[in-house]
């Protein structure tokens, strides 16, 4: 009798079921739950204790519903008591018209509301696709997490890693372990990355390298927008471009337009030319190969044993004729320029270095010091040779002062001066135009024998150990020699004499402390004739 009842029950439950939920009176009962897994359809339903004593075996066009989630497959094992099922073949889950989850196998736990999808898994949420071989989808949190390598595609790039998750509600992906984010314009490598598929913003939370064009970026914290290709980086990021790199407290980098704004404790280094720029704000233009620095701006040349430090309000490093054979660079320092090196110090209002003639030109009240020597004029040009001084040209109101002791100075003035150096040491000086000299010669025991005053149209002075060794003057020069005890007070100093030791930078840190000259010590204003520019009217006549 019991066998007959079993046969009859199996006969009826084996009939096809179409578009109806399995009623409670046709399946084993289960405790009432807040939310059920409902069987919507199956072609064949059977019970086979040998296969699974706790499950209904469903075959053909199987579909389930749990709340707003619909699930489809070729066949399934349905555990009504556990409110769960196993799905096999062409597994598909749908929620609304935007979320789809595909795979070859699904283990759905109705108690925890977690769907475990395996093999050829694809999660589609609007315009994004996540592919992996193993994904667990938590419907309580609308969170899918994978652990056997995953790839996320959206309209701006491809994101890969070994582990990660995707939140459907926030549309945010968290990728871990060997992360890559890339498209044809950039490549980002990290160990941890947060990515919002709506805003297209990747959040960097660990050591990360990014490559775009010829630039490499390193950062531990920041964001990168894959749509705009804007990066905002903090905690001392570094940008590398060929032989140059820059680091700072924070960097905004527009990789699309090729420029960056750099903020706080900036260090910009040229490793080939061995120089550096520092400051509090910088603008870097990769397209024009130019740099602008301000806020305690400083340029440092460390190409030689003794480094040279230059400070001004603003420093520009500009490149001209880029990508041509006539490429050259200019470095411009504006306002309150102060420079310090062990063998040379300088101040002026502005300074320009031109790589075409390796000339550094100082404008407006420039002063140079070399040991006990002080040089000044209206304009000073310093010509370099392999980062050492080759020769110096002082133009207009040129003045040379050499301190011998606290009250004795060798002094030379003229319209123009030329200084020639050998191995960085001053060897020869030419003074041209309205030359006046106050010179103290020495005897054999280095005692001053008197004071020599000379006027001439031109002189040549030869130097040794940064001091005047001898002076050559033309025969038509005029001069008077005074013994030391008979020096006239009014002849001891030239009328343009000035000793600016209080202005001189004392160290590389002192260049940030501006000290101007006294108002009575400014150079005389010389009126210069200007040639009128031709006009079109002149050519018409």
Report each predicted region and the residues it spans.
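Bacterial Sec-dependent N-terminal signal peptides
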Residues: 1-26, 541
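N-terminal amphipathic/hydrophobic interface segments
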Residues: 20-541
């Amino acid at each position: 009798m019991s066998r007959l009842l079993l046969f009859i029950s199996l006969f009826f439950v084996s009939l096809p079921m179409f578009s109806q939920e399995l009623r409670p009176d046709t399946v084993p009962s289960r405790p009432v739950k807040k939310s059920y897994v409902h069987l919507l359809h199956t072609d064949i339903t059977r019970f086979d204790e040998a296969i699974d004593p706790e499950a209904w075996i469903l075959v053909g066009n199987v579909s389930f519903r749990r709340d707003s989630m619909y699930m489809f497959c070729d066949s399934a094992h349905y555990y009504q008591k556990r409110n769960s099922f196993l799905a096999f073949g062409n597994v598909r889950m749908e929620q609304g018209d935007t979320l789809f989850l595909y795979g070859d196998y699904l283990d759905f736990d109705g108690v925890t509301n977690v769907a475990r999808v395996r093999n050829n898994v694809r999660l589609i949420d609007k315009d994004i696709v996540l592919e992996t071989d193993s994904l667990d989808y938590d419907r309580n949190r609308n969170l899918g997490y994978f652990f056997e390598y995953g790839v996320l595609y959206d309209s701006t790039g491809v994101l890969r890693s070994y582990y990660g998750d995707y939140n459907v509600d926030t549309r945010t992906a968290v990728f871990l372990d060997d992360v890559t984010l890339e498209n044809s314009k950039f490549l980002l490598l990290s160990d941890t990355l947060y990515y919002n598929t709506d805003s297209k913003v990747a959040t960097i939370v660990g050591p990360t390298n990014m490559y775009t064009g010829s630039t490499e970026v390193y950062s531990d914290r920041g964001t990168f927008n894959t749509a705009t290709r804007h990066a905002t980086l903090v905690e001392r990021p570094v940008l590398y471009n060929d032989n140059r790199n820059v680091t700072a407290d924070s960097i905004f980098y527009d990789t699309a337009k090729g420029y960056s704004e750099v903020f706080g404790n900036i260090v910009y280094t040229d490793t080939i030319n061995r120089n550096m720029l520092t400051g509090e704000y910088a603008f870097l233009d990769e397209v024009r190969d130019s740099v602008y620095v301000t806020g305690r701006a400083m340029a440092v040349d460390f190409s030689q044993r003794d480094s040279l430090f230059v400070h001004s309000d603003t420093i520009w490093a500009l490149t001209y004729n880029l990508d041509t054979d006539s490429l050259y660079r200019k470095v411009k320092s504006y306002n309150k320029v102060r420079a310090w090196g062990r063998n040379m110090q300088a101040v002026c209002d502005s300074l320009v270095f031109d790589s075409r003639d390796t000339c550094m030109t100082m404008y407006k009240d420039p002063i140079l010091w070399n040991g006990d020597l002080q040089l000044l004029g209206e304009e000073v040009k310093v010509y370099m040779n392999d980062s050492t001084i080759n020769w110096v040209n002082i133009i207009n109101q040129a003045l040379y002062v050499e301190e011998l002791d606290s009250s004795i100075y060798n002094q030379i003035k003229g319209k123009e001066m030329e200084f020639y150096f050998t191995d960085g040491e001053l060897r020869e000086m030419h003074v041209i135009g309205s030359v006046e000299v106050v010179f103290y010669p020495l005897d054999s025991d280095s005692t001053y024998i008197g004071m020599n005053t000379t006027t001439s149209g031109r002189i040549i002075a030869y130097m040794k150990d940064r001091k005047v060794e001898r002076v050559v003057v033309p025969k038509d020069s005029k001069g008077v020699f005074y013994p030391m005890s008979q020096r006239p007070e009014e002849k001891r100093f030239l009328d343009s004499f000035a000793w600016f030791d209080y202005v001189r930078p004392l160290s590389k840190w002192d260049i940030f402390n501006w000290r101007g000259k006294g108002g009575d010590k400014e150079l005389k204003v010389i009126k210069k004739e200007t040639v009128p520019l031709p006009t079109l009217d002149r050519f018409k006549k």
